Structures are given as structure tokens and as C-alpha cells.
Amino acid sequence: MIKILVSNDDGVTAPGIVALTNALASSYDVMTVGPDRNCSGASNSLTLTNPLRINTLSNGYVSVSGTPTDCVHLAIRELYTDEPDMVVSGINAGANMGDDTLYSGTVAAAMEGRFLGLPAIAVSLVGSKLKHYDSAAFFTSKIIKGLLESPVAQDQILNINVPDLPVEQIKGIKVTRLGARHKAAGMLKTQDPAGRDIFWLGPPGEEQDASEGTDFHAVTNGYVSVTPLTVDLTAFNQITSMKEWIDKL
């Protein structure tokens, strides 16, 4: 049976990872390994100065005292006797579109799977009330089936964003590029009970590039967005001009 590793960044007991695991368990051999707390915004961070501890929960899920990347790395390197066939990260509670992908622990967990040579998917549910995890699970299952039948290039992951709608109201699937946000709002400053300044990150910026063809545009218009993301961040179209710039120094 096909083996799928499921992870996330919202924590191993979050509703999204439960919905995803339940949807896949009837067709695949699923191992669910996630962080023991919410690690949203953890990106590709690793735990380097503390040991990782694991705990198997009553439902069989494995809780890890680390980041999403730690979870995937530990599962593949230690918990599996034979490697899984695929890594699926999610279902995230909220969008991972545009610039979000740089900060996302959900995307990072999928990236770690790809770093270790496995096909990988990150999936997020986009909306304010987040009622329809079943819709995200439905489309994820459909895309997994397609990937197993016809794999994509090995240097990429698929970043999926699903509008928070019933399945029958979703118009279809669109392949997209990343959009972009305006810069985030300023820090929120307040004081603790002792009168010392404390700070909270402000809300993310509003959509800046949500034009047709972007993930923002697709989801806003009722479509599932599938964006292929590459691991290599090199700006290849700038290599020649950068050489010319360096030569002038």
C-alpha cells in the first residue's frame, strides 16, 4: 500500500490535520506526525540546541517537540523503516499564498519532504470561518491520485489553496503563480503588567498583486489554486546582469 506521511504547522491535534488524515486513511497507509504546539510562521526552521521528544497519542498520531521541518525530517529518517511514498502537509488553517509561502511552516514541511527526495504537497484552507476542511481534503485526495499516476518534476512541490466553500460550490482547479502582498502593518506595542513594553507582529499586508493568473485571484473567484514551487531560489534571469554589475566594481 502507498505510504503517505502527513504533517502540518498548526499542531498535531489541529482540525485540518485530523480531516486530512481521516480522508486519506481509507486509501493509503498514513502516518501522522506533527508538532506538539502551533508552529505557524516557523518556515524552514530546525531545532538545533535542544533534543526532540516524541509522544504517540491515543489516536496513533505522533507528537514532536519541534518544528514542522523537524517533524518531517525525524519521521522520514527515524520513524519509518522504509521511506514513505509522499509527504502531504496541512490542512493549514488559513491561506498560504503569495509571500506567505516564505514564512509558512506548512509549505516548509512539504519542502523538507522534497529535500529528502519525496513528492510533496502543501495544502491550506482559505477563509474566515474555516468550515469546509472536507473540501480541502477532497481536492487534496484528487491531486494525490494524479501525482501517483503521473509524477511532476522532482525539483518542485505543489502548493494548494482551497476556498472555504462546499465542494459543489468550488468551480474547479487552476494552476497559478504566486501573487504578492503589500508590506505588513507595523508592530503592535503594549505593556505587560509590570509596565514593560511588549510587541506583537502586525497583521499581514493586503493583496498587492492579485491579478488574473495568481493564487489570490483563483481562490477569490472560487477556484482551487495549485502553484508549483521550486526549492532553488536562484534568480536565474539575473545571472548575466549580475555578472556585468560585479565586473564594474
Curated annotation (Swiss-Prot):
Q: Which keywords accompany this UniProt record?
A: Cytoplasm, Hydrolase, Metal-binding, Nucleotide-binding
According to UniProt, the reaction catalysed is: a ribonucleoside 5'-phosphate + H2O = a ribonucleoside + phosphate
Q: Per its record, what are the GO molecular function terms?
A: 3'-nucleotidase activity; 5'-nucleotidase activity; exopolyphosphatase activity; metal ion binding; nucleotide binding
- Record's Gene Ontology CC terms? cytoplasm
Where does the record place it?
A: Cytoplasm
For the ligand (a divalent metal cation), the binding residues are D9, D10, S40, N92
Q: What is its EC number?
A: 3.1.3.5
Names of the cofactor(s): a divalent metal cation
Lineage top rank: taxon: Bacteria
Extract the InterPro entries matched here.
SurE, SurE-like_Pase/nucleotidase, SurE-like_sf
- What SUPFAM superfamilies does the record point to? SurE-like
**Record note on cofactor:** Binds 1 divalent metal cation per subunit.
Per the similarity annotation, which family is this? Answer: Belongs to the SurE nucleotidase family.
Q: What does this protein do?
A: Nucleotidase that shows phosphatase activity on nucleoside 5'-monophosphates.
Q: Which HAMAP family match?
A: SurE
Output this protein's name.
5'-nucleotidase SurE
